[in-house]
């Protein structure tokens, strides 16, 4: 491969472009550039030739047409041997490197005050055309769309006499096509969500999203299934997608799915140190405490059998005392927290197979995004189930109101039940779960399982509270809970037989709250 002799630079994101161009110039590379990029380079003593000077054709239409010229695209697309005669005939010089990034369409339309006209003006035309041309002809041209690649390209040029390997050019070309695909997908999503009268729908006519492969796995949910882990571009902070693995074996398919479930649940608790232990995507123990150690001990005690080999999630940085308690008490597949102190990390190294993750802090203001459910031949798309019921919106429907402690436990249980597979019943007392009934086709059966779990763990269900993810269709489910000693219930309400269920609660002197919000989870 011949050394790079001529480069075209046209960037919206000017991060690192000046030192990059300086080093290209030092290697004798001739630089072509456009508008603001050319001005910046010239201001920094870089001899960049403006495109309009090079082509003899001015920029026009307010900058809409800059690089759409045969002398530019011929220089990029020309096959160095096959098209050499044509290039010479029309005085088209080869362009060996294209460094381009695009108008910030995604950032522009994310602004609340962005109107359609502004969005349209931020649709880049020349940039994607340059990138696609350079990527297509990667056999002869290096294309750079990401400022993070400048240093890598320069190092390879310095090591190879100014040239780049075919493998590097191919990799950068693929990256360029991925970038333009995502760019066009963002435009299509934005415009496709607009109605003819200018209103915006939450759901575009076609839905386009790009995920980048982060990890290939030994297998999927089961050993006979192939699998890989893909993450959104860009992935949201404070998630399994961005978590840093501090130690342990490679995360498996099931590890990632279960850790995501545990993290989603623990994020719902912001006011006290909280621990969530998950098994097969269902919380088996959730508890708050005065510190993380107490929260963990209480969550573990809620279901010690199920906690074995589970996923442990915390809403605060993991400290040494809690880390020591965990490794003395149980085997865990994964521990995840916003951060892990240095001493806690040192303690955990005594159990090198435990996967320890630091996911970073999360913000309650961070957009939750979409929930995807794949079906054969399609995709179901919905909001994440992150809505909460304001305290003032809770409706006491029984003769007796909950006591302050009952109310506190009801709100705690209500936060947990939305993360349990339907039909879901959660028994709770004093800020922790004591029994979880998950995934049953009968709500009565889920309640019975929750009671059984509580008794197996040595808890009394007397004066515990119950949360149900959906309404009780009949009074029998409520009566079963009352017989177990449940003193207060929180549920959505909305059954045709609500009056019968309320009557049953009154007969047993139970307090019951209606939330008006269902939390099915499938």
UniProtKB/Swiss-Prot annotation:
UniProt cross-references to SMART domains, sorted A to Z: AICARFT_IMPCHas, MGS
EC number of the protein: 2.1.2.3, 3.5.4.10
One GO-annotated biological process of the protein: 'de novo' IMP biosynthetic process
MGS-like domain span: 1-145
Gene3D superfamilies xref list: 3.40.140.20, Methylglyoxal synthase-like domain
Gene Ontology MF, one: phosphoribosylaminoimidazolecarboxamide formyltransferase activity
Domain of life the protein comes from: Bacteria
InterPro entries reported in the protein's UniProt record: AICAR_Tfase_dup_dom_sf, Cytidine_deaminase-like, MGS-like_dom, MGS-like_dom_sf, PurH-like
Pathway: Purine metabolism; IMP biosynthesis via de novo pathway; 5-formamido-1-(5-phospho-D-ribosyl)imidazole-4-carboxamide from 5-amino-1-(5-phospho-D-ribosyl)imidazole-4-carboxamide (10-formyl THF route): step 1/1; Purine metabolism; IMP biosynthesis via de novo pathway; IMP from 5-formamido-1-(5-phospho-D-ribosyl)imidazole-4-carboxamide: step 1/1
Keyword Hydrolase: yes
Keyword vocabulary terms for this entry: Hydrolase, Multifunctional enzyme, Purine biosynthesis, Transferase
Gene Ontology cellular-component annotations: cytosol
Catalysed transformations (reactions): (6R)-10-formyltetrahydrofolate + 5-amino-1-(5-phospho-beta-D-ribosyl)imidazole-4-carboxamide = 5-formamido-1-(5-phospho-D-ribosyl)imidazole-4-carboxamide + (6S)-5,6,7,8-tetrahydrofolate; IMP + H2O = 5-formamido-1-(5-phospho-D-ribosyl)imidazole-4-carboxamide
UniProt comment concerning the protein's domains: The IMP cyclohydrolase activity resides in the N-terminal region.
HAMAP family found in the cross-reference section: PurH
PANTHER family, A to Z: BIFUNCTIONAL PURINE BIOSYNTHESIS PROTEIN ATIC, BIFUNCTIONAL PURINE BIOSYNTHESIS PROTEIN PURH
Family designation: Belongs to the PurH family.
Protein name: Bifunctional purine biosynthesis protein PurH
Organism: Nitrosococcus oceani (strain ATCC 19707 / BCRC 17464 / JCM 30415 / NCIMB 11848 / C-107)
Gene assigned in the entry: purH
């Amino acid at each position: 491969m011949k050394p790079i002799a001529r480069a075209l630079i046209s960037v919206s994101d000017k991060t690192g472009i000046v030192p990059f161009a300086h080093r290209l110039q030092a290697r004798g590379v001739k630089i072509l550039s456009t508008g603001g990029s050319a001005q910046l380079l010239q201001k920094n003593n870089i001899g960049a030739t403006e495109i309009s000077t090079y082509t003899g054709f001015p920029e026009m239409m307010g900058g809409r047409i800059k690089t759409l010229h045969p002398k530019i695209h011929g220089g990029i697309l020309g096959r160095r041997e096959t098209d050499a005669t044509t290039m010479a005939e029309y005085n088209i010089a080869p362009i060996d490197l294209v460094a381009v990034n695009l108008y910030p369409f995604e950032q522009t339309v994310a602004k609340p005050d962005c109107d359609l006209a502004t969005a349209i003006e931020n649709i880049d035309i020349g940039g994607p055309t340059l990138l696609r041309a350079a990527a297509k002809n990667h056999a002869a041209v290096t294309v750079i769309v990401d400022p993070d690649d400048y240093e890598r390209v320069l190092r390879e040029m310095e090591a190879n006499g100014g040239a780049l390997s075919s493998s590097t050019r191919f990799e950068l070309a693929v990256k360029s096509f991925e970038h333009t695909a995502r760019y066009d997908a963002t435009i299509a999503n934005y415009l496709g969500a607009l109605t003819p009268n200018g209103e915006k729908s939450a759901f575009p006519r076609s839905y386009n999203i790009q995920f980048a492969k982060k990890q290939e796995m030994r297998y999927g949910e089961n050993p006979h299934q192939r699998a890989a882990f893909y993450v959104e571009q860009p992935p949201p902070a404070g998630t399994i997608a961005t978590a840093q693995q501090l130690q342990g074996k490679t995360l498996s398919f099931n590890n990632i799915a279960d850790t995501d479930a545990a993290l989603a649940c623990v994020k719902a608790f912001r006011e006290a140190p909280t621990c969530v232990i998950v098994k097969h995507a269902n919380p088996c123990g959730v508890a708050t405490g005065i510190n993380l150690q107490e929260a963990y001990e209480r969550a573990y005690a809620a279901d010690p059998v199920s906690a074995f080999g589970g996923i442990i999630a915390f809403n605060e940085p993991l400290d040494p005392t809690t880390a020591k308690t965990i490794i003395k008490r149980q085997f865990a597949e994964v521990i995840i927290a916003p951060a892990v102190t240095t001493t806690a990390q040192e303690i955990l190294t005594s159990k090198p197979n435990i996967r320890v993750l630091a996911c970073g802090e999360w913000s309650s203001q961070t957009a939750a995004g979409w929930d995807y459910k794949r079906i054969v031949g399609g995709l179901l798309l919905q909001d994440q189930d992150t809505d909460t019921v304001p305290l003032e919106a809770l409706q006491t429907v029984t003769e007796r109101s909950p006591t302050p402690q009952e109310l506190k436990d009801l709100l705690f249980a209500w936060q947990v039940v939305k993360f349990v597979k339907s039909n879901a019943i959660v028994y709770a007392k004093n800020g922790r779960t004591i029994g979880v009934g998950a995934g049953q086709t009968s709500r009565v059966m889920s309640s019975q399982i929750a009671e059984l779990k509580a008794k197996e763990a040595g808890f009394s269900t007397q004066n515990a509270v119950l949360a149900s993810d959906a309404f009780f269709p009949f009074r029998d489910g409520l009566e079963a809970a009352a017989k177990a000693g449940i003193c207060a219930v929180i549920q959505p309400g909305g059954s045709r037989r609500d009056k019968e269920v309320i009557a049953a609660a009154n007969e047993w002197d139970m307090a019951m709250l209606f939330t008006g919000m269902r939390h099915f989870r499938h």
